[in-house]
């Protein structure tokens, strides 16, 4: 969840910490089979669930649907004509806070998350026109070809010698530790 303002002195943090975590995703590795590989229509499929995942005239929040279908498909491009689908914007993310759940409850959540990914695959194939892509059978040693565990975008901060916070970005020269003089690994997360 989110740290409170006091923990790291970040003015954008909430006053009280909470246990709200980011969505989980059952990532799909899609492979270009070179021919139509449409899956059967999943139960509870409703295309409107995904209209805003890419730019679409059907998206009621068109100002938020900034990515074209091609850009979404290229976001997770892999070698050998494969694509990783891990799309947080009205895609295959699934919210559930597992922290307080027992193993049986978590299994139900994981099943629902996989079902959402399958609905998104159906949308990709039928609404976006990428019917030559389907789940690769070469990636994971599982019956359903999904990863063994879901992906989370979130992790707790590491409490090290120095803990990096937003303040080191906003006011780098006003901090106790002169991190602006050190190297920092920065990733590009274009979503």
Regions found by a protein language model. Give the residues of each.
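Flavin (FAD/FMN)-binding glycine-rich loop and adjacent Rossmann-like elements that form
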Residues: 1-191
């Amino acid at each position: 969840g989110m740290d409170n303002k006091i923990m790291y002195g970040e003015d954008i943090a909430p006053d009280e910490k909470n246990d709200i975590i980011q969505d989980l995703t059952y990532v799909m590795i899609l492979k270009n089979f070179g021919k139509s590989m449409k899956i059967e229509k999943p139960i509870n499929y409703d295309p409107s669930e995904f209209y805003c995942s890419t730019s679409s005239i059907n998206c009621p929040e068109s100002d938020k649907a900034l990515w074209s279908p091609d850009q979404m498909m290229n976001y997770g491009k892999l070698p050998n004509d494969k694509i990783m689908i891990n799309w947080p914007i009205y895609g295959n993310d699934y919210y559930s806070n597992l922290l307080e759940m027992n193993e049986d409850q978590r299994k139900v959540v994981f099943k629902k998350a996989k079902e959402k990914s399958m609905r998104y695959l159906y949308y990709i194939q039928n609404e976006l026109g990428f019917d030559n892509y389907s789940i690769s059978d070469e990636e994971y040693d599982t019956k359903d070809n999904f990863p063994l565990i879901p992906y989370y975008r979130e992790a707790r901060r590491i409490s090290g010698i120095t803990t990096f916070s937003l303040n080191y970005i906003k006011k780098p020269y006003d901090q106790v530790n002169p991190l602006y003089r050190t190297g920092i690994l920065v990733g590009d997360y274009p979503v």
